Amino acid sequence: VLKPSEHSSNTTNILQKIIEKSFERGHVDIVSGGPEIGQKLLELNWDYIFFTGSTEIGKIVASSAAKTLTPVTLELGGNNPCVVDKDVSIKLACKRIIFGKFINCGQTCIAPNFIAVNKKVKQEFLKKLVNELNKTFGKNSHESPYYSRIINKKHVERLSKLIKGYKLIYGGNFNLENNFFEPTVLEVSSIKDNILKDEIFGPILPILSYDTTEELTEILNEYENPLAFYVFSNNISFAESLISNNSFGGGAINDTIGQIVNKKLPFGGVGNSGIGKYHGYESFKTFSHFKPYIIKSNYFDLSFKYKLSEDSLLFKFTRKFLRYISI
């Protein structure tokens, strides 16, 4: 049974057509509706529950599943960092960050949520970021055939409130009538700012800067267990040290969102960003119950296994052997 979001009716219609063409009636079903339908579904006893959504709702799903000991996979959100080192190919980094951030208008769970850029390259980075945005979407992104729209008016309003009071480097325009929200880049002075408290899930890219490794560590430690983690650096030792010392679901060095392309790589979160993993063979394993068993021969039987005397040679040998291998 699939329960898509009530906000994505067009996607639901496409899924319905695919299912009707691919499966016999009754094998796979789609259930439409709002949160009340989702709550009713959670009251049923399932073999497995797979949920994609916010951490807040993920906790509700996990709590409901626990009542019947139903296993779950939770693919949740995350405040995904993107670190830009001083030793970096800036133009290429900008192009790849723009692709990963603004695809589907920033409405992906693995989009970079903010940039932490080294102060030594900050101004050059911002200049080239703006240039690449203009090249990608044109100076009027409203007319670009490559730029998406926000899912609904409610979220356009939410995003418009997020950017109030910030110094805008690029964008900031929106249109409630057609759910347009311009690609937006803004400066953030503190890791405690409201815009960085939660996953943005939209085309807004806050820019933080750091000077020392200690400052960068302080920034990264502020956000627990993101779903994705990105580092742009020509210094692979520096990049790998960040990868090793931070907990996250999956990530990339010198790229964004590329980690989901390889079907052999498992995808999933950790801690607040999710439980379990899937993609490729991992998806098959996720939705399968591995049931081990043996078939015992009836042609011979070892009688001593039923009653092993402490005086027997086999018992003495076994005890000495176990002591030997435990040394």
Task: Cite the ranges covered by each PLM segment.
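A structured beta-alpha segment of the ubiquitous adenosine-cofactor-binding alpha/beta core
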Residues: 29-47
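Short, surface-exposed connector motifs at secondary-structure boundaries
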Residues: 1, 22, 42-48, 221-226
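Conserved C-terminal structural/oligomerization subdomain of aldehyde/semialdehyde dehydrogenase
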Residues: 83, 180-327
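Short beta->alpha connector loops at strand-helix junctions that form conserved
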Residues: 3-5, 32, 52-53, 85-86
